Curated annotation (Swiss-Prot):
Domain notes: The RxLR-dEER motif acts to carry the protein into the host cell cytoplasm through binding to cell surface phosphatidylinositol-3-phosphate.
Gene for this chain: RXLR-C21
Motif (RxLR-dEER): 32-65
Statement: the UniProt record of this protein carries the keyword Cytoplasm: no
Origin superkingdom: Eukaryota
Induction per the UniProt record: Expression is up-regulated during the late plant infection stages.
The keyword Signal is assigned to this record: yes
The protein, known as: Secreted RxLR effector protein RXLR-C21
Subcellular location: Secreted; Host endoplasmic reticulum membrane
A GO CC annotation given for this chain: host cell endoplasmic reticulum membrane
Transmembrane segments: 101-121
Annotated signal sequence range: 1-23
């Protein structure tokens, strides 16, 4: 019984790690491409299509600050995702929200699996 649990936990952890590494490699390249490329609708649309997201609204906000400061221009993009509905995404972090959730879930499952293994083998 302990051997079966050990084998099962190793399989689950290896699948989680490989899936998380795969997701992070894609997100890093997309985020890097966004940082290196001028922000325009074309890049954002290509990224949205590659992430299976539909651009719902493109809103550009210009904020005038104090006379000693420059104007601040912020691009806020609203994506419609089948998983999360319509939500704003900062252009620097488009595509990394899902990988963050995946990483957190992987860490939680990793701790749970090894906590159970420790309990089983410490008896």
């Amino acid at each position: 019984m302990r051997l079966h649990l050990l084998v099962l936990s190793v399989i689950v952890v290896s699948l989680l790690v490989s899936d998380n590494a795969h997701a992070n490699s894609h997100d890093d390249s997309k985020t890097r491409a966004l940082r290196e490329t001028p922000i325009n609708g074309l890049v954002t649309n290509q990224l949205a299509v590659s992430r299976n997201l539909t651009p719902a609204k493109f809103i550009t906000n210009s904020e005038e600050r104090h006379s000693s400061e420059k104007k601040s221009r912020r691009l806020q993009i609203y994506f419609h995702s089948p998983y999360y509905g319509i939500h704003p995404v900062d252009y620097h972090y488009v595509g990394s929200y899902e990988s963050g959730v995946t990483t957190i879930c992987s860490i939680v499952l990793f701790v749970m699996v090894f906590g159970c293994l420790y309990k089983i083998f410490s008896q």
